[in-house]
């Protein structure tokens, strides 16, 4: 991605883009060594939805819907819900407002972003929220300030001034969140870098963590079929992802399948079945596959599917 970007554009015009790509790769590497941070966030979201006091539950619902009473913050989350995107600065402001002004659990704010952002990424989203909350760099928080918004997004304040006193400079005291995750580094799993073509009936499971099977090390395989399962990112997530996020995922998978069909000259299929593990096993059985190959997923929802997928394949 960076090579192609820099081939087409001068560095000064894409520097921020390059930085964001590098940050995403850094976050992915950090989370890969500390998978319990992802697991802990998932557990906390479930626990909080079950145990929140009713008043806090209603406030979570109001702020997440853009009904907090601070107009510029409400405009940010309303744009997110409507489009699936907001500028990176706005993401930081709203996250800080949620945690330090509203004093709501960071885990539930991260869940709002994860459900609505079209570019939601398990590592970048979870760890960025932890950073704002003072967990990623222990004790270092990020506080939203009206003067900062006025500097970088003056039009936002001009048209949305109601409640601005709540984020005036010096009005917000930081909240240091409690740490629930085990952040001890773990060894990385050593996956094979080459898949030998042993003349067996092979199929590729194409998933959202890597949509370039036509690039090595899988590029030279002779395949029976390639399949993708649109519910893989949603299967383990409650509440459900937004319809816009699901549609974006389905579009990306369809594009990957189209390129796979052209490159490998084999049939492809895309399923929207609610149980991707069962559907994957049925696909393997239907085509008489002897091996199912996939790129190793990074820590996140696709990796969470590996145990049930393995269990289903072992039974088929």
Regions found by a protein language model. Give the residues of each.
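Structured secondary-structure scaffolds
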Residues: 1-122, 131-137, 144-209
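Trp/Phe/Arg-rich N-terminal binding region typifying the photolyase-homology
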Residues: 1-19, 23, 28-29, 33-49, ...
